[in-house]
A protein has these predicted regions:
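Interdomain/boundary linker segments immediately adjacent to catalytic/signaling cores
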Residues: 1-57
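Short loop/turn segments at secondary-structure transitions that flank enzyme active sites
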Residues: 69, 97, 117-120
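Amphipathic alpha-helical segments that form well-ordered structural scaffolds
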Residues: 57-66
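A short acidic/basic microdomain associated with nuclease active sites
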Residues: 66-84
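Acidic, metal/cofactor-coordinating or nucleic-acid-engaging core segments within structured domains
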Residues: 120-182
Length: 182
């Protein structure tokens, strides 16, 4: 359980940043996480945002560890507010066909719309995710560019460059798959 919780937490903040940020704010690590990083049950939007975050992280893990996509982890990190979700395509993953990562038409990008629910009585998240995934064609380019910039800000220059490859589909075609999860 501890390893899984640590994995989830690292989607929000890196170890070294957590220690520094907690110290600068005069807080324990646990207090800093509760007050500044992880959405909490007793806060407005906290349960909804946390449910969405966890569902997105699980989908990221599925794409990365089961289907072998590279999945940028940027959405939960350094938010302007812990209960503020990023807009756009929920999860993107990519694969390069060529080991040198030279663009080919066999490269793959998967754009996934994710929906979560907080109650047992609502069983329609997948239907909502499928409906929302149809909007992704219009917002995917903005999401890829935002992801590229966020990765660069987070110091992940290599992955930022890899993601940029998927910006200009007409110039560098690739296989694109839209998916939904809920």
């Amino acid at each position: 359980f501890d390893e899984w919780a640590l994995h989830i937490r690292r989607n929000y903040i890196e170890d070294e940043d957590l220690l520094i940020d907690a110290e600068i704010n005069g807080m324990s690590v646990e207090q800093y996480l509760r007050e500044y990083v992880i959405p909490q049950r007793d806060e407005t939007l906290g349960p909804t945002v946390r449910s969405g975050d966890i569902t997105e992280i699980i989908v990221c893990d599925l794409l990365e560890f089961i289907f072998n996509y590279s999945v940028p982890r940027y959405k939960q990190k350094n938010r302007s507010g812990k209960n503020n979700s990023e807009h756009g395509t929920d999860v993107i993953g990519y694969k390069f066909f060529d080991k040198s990562k030279k663009p080919t038409e066999k490269d793959e990008l998967i754009a996934t719309e994710v929906k979560a629910v907080l109650t047992r009585s609502d069983y329609s998240p997948l239907e909502k995710a499928i409906a929302e995934s149809k909007k992704d064609e219009q917002r995917l380019a903005r999401t890829i560019d935002y992801c590229r910039k966020r990765l660069k800000e987070l110091g992940n220059i290599e992955q930022s460059s890899e993601v940029a490859r998927f910006l200009l589909k007409p110039d560098n075609n690739y296989k694109l798959t839209y998916a939904a999860a809920g």
